[in-house]
């Protein structure tokens, strides 16, 4: 059995847990960097085989690119081992290539967000300005992923209990073709509370637009949901004028940061964000948790 055949089996298996477009793009990216390995018998591939290939890749590619490829290769070899295609788990000892964080996602404070919205409100050249501002406010005040916010339909908002049901994500390609898909993980299916202020804004918006219960909350005149670029330019322009860097995903991080800064228990933050495990929340916001340790130290010093 060749490495290519094992790889094909792996991606078929892995593809069951992710969107088809994700599986295709990851497979294409991996294939592009391993043509020399594809026709080798899987049993002839050793630790040295992979590490020599990694060394060659490092001579011409960015470390992060090689790191991602290496991680995928190890997953494929682990799949081969678990399915009896190879007899050794040598992949565990393959050199680790650190994946550098190419960029840190910026966050903004509540005060900065309020200033950003004030700036956004005077950007009158933008079409559907009020809808875009509401979209940004929803992201900041709920921590929703932008794909989850775009998938919201009117009936998923309960104004009696001020809750939003999150059970789908909306993905769109560069040509504008969109699809509704399950949320990122099963744990991302959740119901979250919203404050009275944002609830009233949502209610007023729905009444103003005469939306039916099955309509997408954020949509074009023909009823189709807003695409990937929706509100992106407005956010970028307003952030630049304010002198900060922030993305739609950064608004989600800003929401989580606000909760942690106000000492909301990490388990509640995890559930609100739809993380599968508290460990993921801790890993993502470990710098904030470390800073909060200073609060404990300050308290102890005052006591003693």
Regions found by a protein language model. Give the residues of each.
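DNA/chromatin major-groove-contacting recognition/catalytic segments
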Residues: 175-181, 283-304
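Short, basic (Lys/Arg/His-rich) helix/loop patches that form interaction surfaces
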Residues: 40, 63, 120-129, 142, ...
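A short, basic/aromatic helix-end/turn motif that makes direct DNA contacts
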Residues: 151-157, 270-276, 286-287
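N-terminal core-binding DNA-recognition domain of tyrosine site-specific recombinases/integrases
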Residues: 3-79, 83-85, 102, 124-128, ...
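Short amphipathic helical patch at the helix-1/turn junction of helix-turn-helix
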Residues: 54, 71, 139-140, 260-261
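DNA breakage-rejoining catalytic core of tyrosine-based enzymes
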Residues: 43, 86-88, 99-119, 174-195, ...
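Conserved tyrosine-mediated DNA breakage-rejoining catalytic core shared by Y-recombinases
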Residues: 151-204
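Basic, Lys/Arg- and aromatic-enriched nucleic-acid-binding interface segment
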Residues: 82, 86, 93-152, 160
């Amino acid at each position: 059995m060749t490495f290519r055949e094992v790889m094909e089996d792996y991606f078929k298996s892995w593809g069951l847990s992710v969107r088809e477009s994700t599986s295709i793009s990851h497979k294409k990216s991996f294939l592009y960097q391993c043509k020399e390995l594809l026709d080798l018998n899987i049993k002839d591939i050793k630790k040295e085989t992979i590490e020599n290939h990694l060394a060659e890749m490092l001579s011409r590619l960015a470390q992060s690119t090689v790191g991602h490829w290496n991680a995928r290769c190890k997953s494929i070899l682990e799949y081969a081992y678990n399915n009896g295609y190879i007899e050794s788990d040598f992949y565990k000892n393959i050199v680790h290539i650190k994946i550098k964080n190419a960029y840190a996602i910026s966050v903004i404070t509540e005060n900065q967000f309020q200033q950003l919205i004030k700036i956004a409100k005077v950007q009158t050249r933008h079409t559907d300005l009020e809808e875009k501002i509401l979209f940004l406010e929803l992201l900041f005040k709920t921590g929703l992923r932008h794909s989850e916010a775009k998938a919201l339909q009117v009936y998923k908002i309960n104004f009696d209990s001020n809750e939003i049901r999150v059970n789908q994500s909306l993905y769109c390609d560069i040509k504008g073709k969109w699809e509704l898909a399950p949320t990122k993980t099963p744990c991302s299916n959740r119901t979250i509370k919203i404050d009275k202020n944002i609830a009233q804004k949502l209610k007023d918006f729905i009444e103003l637009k005469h939306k039916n219960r099955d309509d997408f909350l954020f949509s074009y005149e023909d009823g189709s949901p807003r695409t990937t670029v929706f509100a992106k330019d407005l956010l970028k322009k307003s952030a630049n004028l304010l002198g900060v860097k922030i993305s739609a995903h950064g608004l989600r991080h800003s929401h989580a940061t606000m909760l942690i800064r106000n000492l909301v228990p990490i388990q509640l933050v995890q559930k609100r964000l739809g993380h599968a495990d508290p460990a993921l929340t801790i890993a993502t916001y470990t710098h904030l948790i470390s800073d909060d340790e200073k609060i404990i130290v300050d308290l102890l010093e005052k006591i003693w």
